[in-house]
Each structure stands twice: as structure tokens, then as C-alpha cells.
């Protein structure tokens, strides 16, 4: 019995299962001191890393106040593959709760998030346990839109100099602003990008995003796109039953629907690490 208890205790105290560490650093907007949550994988030595940008409802569960399961599970998955994961809170340091509703949306805050991404890159590059030239970026929903604004050749956040290099790769889950109306007409990026979307997503529809990305590919961007049949917004969340969100009705009158798609989620759990590994771990 004592051995069993010790084994269970060791499991929960292992580096792989350790709780996140809260850290702070400046956004490159010049005024905001950001909060972020650092998850480190087991083992010693310098590791590659990933910056995470949450969606428009923030990174915390409305029900529990804890970091939402979708981000905790991705943190664990990325740690399992050897990545340090830094989840950036763009909202609470600016006294914002959500940017999903028409009433709550703040364009200035949204467009400042690429500066948060590059503030996070700078923070990670200064850490002795991170390989500063091997860092990726992942964004969900509005954080996915911020990812597009970050990695474009005319980035809203990129500083003039990057001594240890830029992001090596980026992933955008069902990104906002993924269309020709919200992005520059000549948008392209030197950073390889993976975009994952649900075919039934009413909030950030796949069709206009595909049109936009196809045009960027034609201009030389390296982009992979995966559209999951039958999947809604937030398909990669764990155990999220299908749910309508009337409080976040769009200006066009669309009521968003979120929900887990088991097949899409499982594919993403393998596709994302494979994509990151291809570009972040290359010589």
C-alpha cells in the first residue's frame, strides 16, 4: 500500500505533471505588463518553446476561474513532445473580460496582441532553459487572428531587430480575421503556417479563410490547411458538448456554436506536433 501511495504521489509531483508558473514581462506595446503561464517539460537542458494566444473569451474558465481545459491539455501535449509552453494573458492585465460580444469587442486591444506575441518571444529568448532560435506560435480563434497579424510580412508586432531570430512556425486554430476583408490584400508570410478549421464553423467560416490562404500561397507563403468535416468552432476542446452562444451573436446575426469533434481533435493532437517538429527542430 505504501509503495502504491508513493507511486501515485510521484506521478503527480513529476515534472511532466507540474503546475504552471506565473511569469510577467512587458508587451512591446510599451505600456502593458503581461501575465503569462509557463509550462515546462520534464528533464534538463535547453528546449524549444511555443507561445500560446488565447481566444476572445480569455484563457480562464467561466465556471471554475481556472485556466480553461483546452489550454491546459495543449500545454500537457506540447510538454509531452518536449516543448516549453508559454500561455499569454492579453486581457486581465488590460482589465478586459472578453472580446467576443459586439459590446465587448475592443479593436485597439485586438490589434495590440501581436506586440504581446513578440513580447513573449523576447521573454522566452532570455530564458536559459529555452533554445531562443527554436520558438513557435499558436493561436486559437481571435488568438489565431492575432497570429496572422503577427506573422505577416507587415506584422503589427514584429520589432525591427530579432537577434535570435523570429518565430520558426505558427499554428492558427479557426482563426478570426482570416479573410481578404480583414487582412492586407498582399498578405504573405515567411513563417510556415498550419491552419486548422471546422467545416461547420459559423463563427470563423472556413470558406473565406481558404480563399484568403490560397491567395497567400500563390504569393509564396508556406501554408498547410486542414478542414475537418462536421466540426464546429472549438473542435479541439476536450469534452465540450455542442453549445450555442447567443451572448456572442455577431453583427450579422449569427449565433456561434462550439463543440468538440473527437476525430478532428485527435487528428490535431498528432498533426500540430508533427508540423512544429518539421520546422522548429530542423537545422
Spans of features found by a protein language model:
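N-terminal signal peptide c-region/cleavage motif recognized by signal peptidases
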Residues: 14-16
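N-terminal cap/lid segment of alpha/beta-hydrolase-fold proteins
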Residues: 19-45
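Acidic catalytic loop of the alpha/beta-hydrolase fold
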Residues: 200-204, 233-234
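Short alpha-helix in the alpha/beta-hydrolase fold that links the catalytic acid
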Residues: 205-215
